[in-house]
């Protein structure tokens, strides 16, 4: 018997819309202060920039050649000229004499233009002769260069003092290159959120269990969500399995807090059974912002915050125990919360698009449904700009316990309820509906349609 009578309070949660739940999650997480740290450039990858970055120096810092060729004075025009020296990338041209009229210097891509040169003629527009003048080989220039031709001017890529990267930018490979270019040694970034994941229930066993006793299931949720946390850009903390007593569940929550979790995710224990303790515990130790969503799957999804010493706030998501419900609510609510605590702007929280359905879809009577679908761009042979994005609802039965229908899916199709569509019961094929593109490697593919 539990020491706490949690059911009456837990039963009192008002059902809210999926859109309202999303707004509450975003507003709550946006109000939580984010900590900033300075990381070496080598470890800043996949973090979010916390401050604007300005170029200390112009890039390039010198007039540089765009191509392999010859530095010339453009007023000399075509003709045969001696090659007086070479300007390779990395050469200090300040130590070379100015280029005199009617002479040229060999220059490589990225090499600095010497004083006296104002253009580059690419190798393809020249021909090496057998002539020698004062011990210098002679090249024939066949093109009349114009001033600054094939020259990168000082600051043409980045001007000194220019803001080259805004706070809120996710640092990926290209951003690492930019930061290295402007000489940033320590990168100011938001600390990556720490996300604790735990499963609850007496029926749950570790995935490596070879022979399951009757009534037991392998814990797919925890492994799934730990992977999803990493995909979303946070650091996962594996909290294991909390058995079905109120004390064990609360101990697991407190342990996650003590280990520095910014977000805690539990699965199971959020419905109305006599061993569903999550909502009651959260009401005692924190603030429950919602405990029931008018959506399918994921109705009992619970969102709360827990205050601790100072101004520390821990975000808590109680996800349903069915694997599909857990992963769907993760994509819809947990993933955006991770991105907010990472420091990403609102525009980066979800990738939304509109798609055309390819089959009839039965609507739920009262709840919006998030169906696992394969979304792709389809065009006719020879078409490049007139195709359309379609959603294939062929992932099998959409039961909340059937994780197999996530395999191969790359989007969640947002299907309105019958109540939303004034009593209609079926969405006909060819209807345009919103969809949410899933993260990770589930990219939108292109298919050319052949009859």
Regions found by a protein language model. Name each.
Residues 7-8, 64, 346-451:
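C-terminal terminal segments
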Residues 106-108, 142, 166, 197-200, ...:
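Short beta-strand segments
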């Amino acid at each position: 018997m539990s020491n706490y009578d949690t059911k009456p309070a837990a039963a009192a949660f008002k059902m809210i819309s999926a859109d309202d739940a999303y707004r509450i999650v975003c507003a709550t997480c946006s109000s939580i202060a984010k900590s900033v740290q300075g990381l070496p450039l080598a470890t800043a990858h996949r973090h979010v920039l916390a401050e604007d970055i300005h170029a200390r120096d112009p890039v390039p810092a010198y007039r540089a050649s765009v191509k392999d060729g010859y530095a010339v004075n453009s007023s000399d025009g075509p003709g045969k000229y001696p090659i007086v020296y070479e300007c390779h990338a990395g050469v200090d041209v300040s130590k070379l004499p100015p280029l005199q009229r009617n002479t040229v210097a060999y220059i490589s891509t990225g090499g600095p233009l010497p004083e006296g040169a104002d253009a580059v003629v690419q190798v393809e527009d020249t021909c090496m002769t057998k002539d020698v003048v004062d011990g210098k080989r002679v090249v024939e220039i066949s093109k009349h260069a114009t001033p600054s031709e094939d020259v990168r001017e000082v600051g043409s890529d980045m001007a000194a003092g220019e803001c080259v990267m805004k706070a809120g930018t996710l640092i990926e490979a290209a951003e690492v290159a930019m930061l290295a270019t402007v000489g940033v040694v320590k990168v100011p970034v938001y600390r990556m959120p720490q996300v604790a994941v735990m499963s609850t229930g007496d029926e749950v066993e570790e995935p490596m269990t070879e022979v399951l006793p009757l009534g037991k299931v392998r814990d797919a949720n925890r492994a799934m969500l730990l992977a999803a946390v990493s995909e979303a850009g946070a650091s996962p903390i594996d909290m294991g399995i909390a058995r079905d007593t109120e004390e064990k569940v609360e101990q697991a929550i407190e342990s996650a807090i003590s280990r520095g979790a910014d977000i805690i995710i539990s699965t199971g224990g959020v419905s109305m059974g006599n061993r569903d303790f999550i909502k009651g515990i959260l009401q005692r130790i924190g603030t429950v912002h919602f405990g029931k969503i008018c959506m399918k799957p994921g109705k009992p999804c619970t969102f709360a915050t827990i205050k601790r010493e100072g101004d520390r706030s821990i975000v808590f998501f109680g996800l349903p125990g069915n694997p599909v419900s857990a992963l769907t609510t993760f994509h819809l609510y947990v993933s955006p919360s991770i991105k907010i605590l990472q420091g990403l702007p609102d525009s980066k929280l979800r990738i939304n698009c509109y798609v055309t359905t390819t089959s009839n879809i039965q609507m739920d009577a009262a709840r919006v449904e998030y169906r696992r679908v394969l979304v792709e761009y389809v065009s006719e042979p020879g078409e490049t700009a007139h195709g359309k994005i379609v959603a294939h609802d062929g992932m099998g039965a959409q039961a909340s316990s059937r994780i197999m229908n996530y395999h191969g899916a790359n989007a969640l199709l947002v299907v309105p309820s019958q109540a939303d569509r004034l009593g209609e019961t079926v969405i006909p094929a060819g209807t345009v509906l919103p969809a949410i593109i899933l993260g990770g490697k589930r990219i939108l593919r292109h298919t050319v349609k052949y009859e």
